[in-house]
Amino acid sequence: SGAAGEVPGLLPRGLEARREVYILKIAYPKAEPPAIKFAHRKLKVPGRTLIKKLNLEIDTEVQEGKIVGLKEYIKNKDYTEEIIDYEKLEGPLTVRLRKGGDHFVPLGSRGSTKLKKFFIDNKVPKAVRDRVPILSDDKRIVWVVGYRIGDEVKLTDATKKVLKLKVKRVEEAEVPPKP
């Protein structure tokens, strides 16, 4: 009984057995996808940012004052959407991939945790961890896209300006050519 993502067990005829969280996968070995070479990219706020190397499009929208239907929006949003306190951001928002030693304060947490531990605790497969987009400002991780925002940027009763974030996967065919 090893940890998820450990070295697979070899079976006859070249098959491999690998435990991923609570699933035992038996299959022929696949080549790991190549690492993505991507440093970082500043987001347009408000606006749309296309990141071809990650096949992502990120829409940002700033809203001021009392947000009508906010509770309903929060209740119905999915993992591709988040809403944060815009005034708590420090510097421009940047999208990047994880770096060694990354840490953040996940929403609802009392303290900082290493991003690697966060991924393990949330059962994110090893092969996926280096591909999860990270939104950060000049000081900290703001959103581990698809998983959790940082506690420091959550909405409070004092929030006056919100930033809505929506991430969409785009296939190469959908990426508009350069003019």
Predicted regions mapped to residue ranges:
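AMP-forming adenylation/ATP pyrophosphatase catalytic core
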Residues: 1-179
